[in-house]
């Protein structure tokens, strides 16, 4: 699972490498060195600069985008078939959002992981989702393919949501 606020997810008193390697070792049989190498490789895949620095940093020394990438890397290192992402980009500016969305999609495609994303951001949903379910107060208002919900919404609540869609900036596969 990828939690909404990675800053709350990561222990501020422990270095990233200690938390990351411990998480890997709890779920898979490996040495600390093997865990460190897996963590370093996954962080590099998410294009974190200077992975050695990130691994040796405390969470409070990292930006919000870096902490979110660490959380995504930790979750994806488990090789999940299904990943639940709760507002994975909510605390990020739109440029970093676009980068994180692209990296999550690249990992999804590379690893064959299905992602269920919970978000209020219809822009992020339209970029990441094949299917979209729109809910209001715990009630399903609309469900359909991305194209149906984004371009041909039937429900008034969905239409209102789409009027406030922030535009993602940055490069995403030349789109």
Regions found by a protein language model. Give the residues of each.
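Conserved ABC ATPase signature
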Residues: 57-62, 66
């Amino acid at each position: 699972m990828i939690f909404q606020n990675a800053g709350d997810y990561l222990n501020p008193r422990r270095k990233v490498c200690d938390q990351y390697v411990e998480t890997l070792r709890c779920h898979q049989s490996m040495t600390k060195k093997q865990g460190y190498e897996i963590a370093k490789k996954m962080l590099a895949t998410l294009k974190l600069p200077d992975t050695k620095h990130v691994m040796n940093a405390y969470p409070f020394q990292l930006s919000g985008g870096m902490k979110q990438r660490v959380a995504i890397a930790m979750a994806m290192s488990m090789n999940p078939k299904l990943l639940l992402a709760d507002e994975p980009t909510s605390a990020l500016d739109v440029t970093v959002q676009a980068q994180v969305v692209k990296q999550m999609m690249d990992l999804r495609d590379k690893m064959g992981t299905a992602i269920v994303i919970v978000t209020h951001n219809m822009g992020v949903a339209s970029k990441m989702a094949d299917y979209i379910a729109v809910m209001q107060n715990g009630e399903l208002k609309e469900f359909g393919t991305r194209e149906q919900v984004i371009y041909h919404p039937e429900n008034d609540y969905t239409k209102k949501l789409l009027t406030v869609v922030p535009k993602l900036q940055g490069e995403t596969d030349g789109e």
